[in-house]
């Protein structure tokens, strides 16, 4: 990998996944990316002063392998999307391949998370009502930074007392709010026109 990338003048490696961060940092990072730093995308966005001005209020699921290393993840999330954030505790039940390899255990974990989500819904709706942010029966969003957790959280869509629970990445929610609903096709178009260098490793 180091030989493949050595022609690029890389200063910073930005990652969005906690497991990827840990693997890169723990496996000869300095040999592969000499003189580079590694940073989580959420902390990178804060560094660049990119944040939502008027977040509608969110639930936040902190993954077991959080990529946010510089400060408490909740502090980072609130700085990015606003103070109206309620942390949703407990594992989502996905845990990498746990949902596939041990559905018996995963299902029990899922039941506990479902109970937690109902409490979190009540707490977030109270925060939203106090700040006039959303209708009492509006759908809620739960944000995370982990691909496995996003998959697990997507299974809870119908489990709230009122409204639906929509799971998404923090950075995707920010892109949608800052750049508009069509941010993804526009990004792909720019990338395909030469905006991103593709390296096969």
Located regions from the model:
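Iron-sulfur cluster-binding electron-transfer modules in prokaryotic oxidoreductases
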Residues: 1-201
């Amino acid at each position: 990998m180091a030989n493949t990338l050595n022609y690029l003048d890389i200063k910073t490696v930005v990652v969005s996944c906690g497991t990827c961060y840990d693997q890169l940092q723990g496996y000869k990072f300095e040999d592969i990316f000499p003189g580079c730093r590694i940073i989580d995308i959420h902390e990178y966005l804060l560094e660049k002063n990119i944040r939502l001005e008027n977040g509608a209020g969110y639930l936040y699921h902190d993954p077991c392998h959080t990529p946010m290393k510089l400060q408490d993840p909740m502090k980072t999330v609130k700085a990015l999307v606003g103070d109206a954030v309620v942390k949703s505790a407990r594992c989502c039940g996905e845990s990498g391949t746990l949902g596939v390899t041990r559905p018996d255990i995963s299902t029990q974990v899922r039941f506990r998370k479902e109970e937690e989500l109902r409490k979190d819904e009540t707490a977030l709706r109270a925060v939203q009502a106090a700040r006039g942010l959303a209708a009492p029966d509006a759908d809620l969003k739960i944000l995370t930074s982990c691909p496995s957790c996003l998959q697990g959280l997507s299974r809870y869509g119908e489990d709230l007392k009122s409204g639906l629970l929509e799971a998404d990445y923090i950075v995707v929610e920010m892109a949608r709010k800052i750049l508009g609903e069509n941010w993804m096709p526009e990004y792909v178009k720019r990338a395909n026109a030469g905006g991103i260098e593709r390296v096969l490793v």
